[in-house]
């Protein structure tokens, strides 16, 4: 399950302390660090460049929590007209907009004509470096 302790098995020094003692550490669980509600959390990969201004790059792994109440200015994964998208939720003058974080993309106004569901709120992003 990825939990436990890292043990460096270098024997017990009878003289000077082992240099490996400086590197002993507890193993962390990414589930414990990143997932607050296991039953409502899922992961998805970013595809595209529309959210680069928010630090979400192509192929990043998003941690998404469906139990968090959507709010103005939160980044959400939404299903609109048959497609998934990740955008910032903006409420302006009583209207809901899906705002990209890249000036090359236009905001999407959500209207009654759209098939629309907010799937969840992005809580974390996992990146490769």
List PLM regions with ranges.
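Structural motif
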Residues: 59-60, 74
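Short, positionally conserved secondary-structure boundary motifs
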Residues: 1-52, 84, 91-95, 106, ...
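Low-complexity, intrinsically disordered Gly/Pro/Thr-rich segments
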Residues: 101-112
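Short acidic low-complexity segments
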Residues: 64-71
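A short glycine-leucine-enriched loop at secondary-structure breakpoints
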Residues: 53-57
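Hydrophobic beta-strand signal
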Residues: 63-64, 77
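Short, compositionally biased
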Residues: 72-86, 90-96
């Amino acid at each position: 399950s990825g939990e436990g302790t890292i043990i460096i098995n270098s024997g017990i020094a009878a003289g000077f302390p082992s240099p490996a003692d400086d590197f002993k550490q507890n193993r962390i669980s990414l589930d414990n660090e990143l997932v607050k509600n296991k039953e409502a959390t899922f992961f998805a990969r970013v595809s595209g460049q529309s959210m680069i201004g928010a630090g979400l790059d192509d192929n990043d792994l998003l941690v998404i929590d469906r139990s968090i109440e959507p709010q103005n200015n939160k980044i959400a994964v939404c299903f609109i007209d048959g497609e998934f998208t990740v955008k910032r939720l903006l409420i302006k003058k009583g209207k809901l907009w899906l705002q990209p974080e890249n000036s090359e993309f236009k905001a999407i106004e959500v209207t009654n004509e759209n098939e629309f569901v907010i799937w969840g709120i992005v809580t974390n992003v996992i990146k490769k470096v």
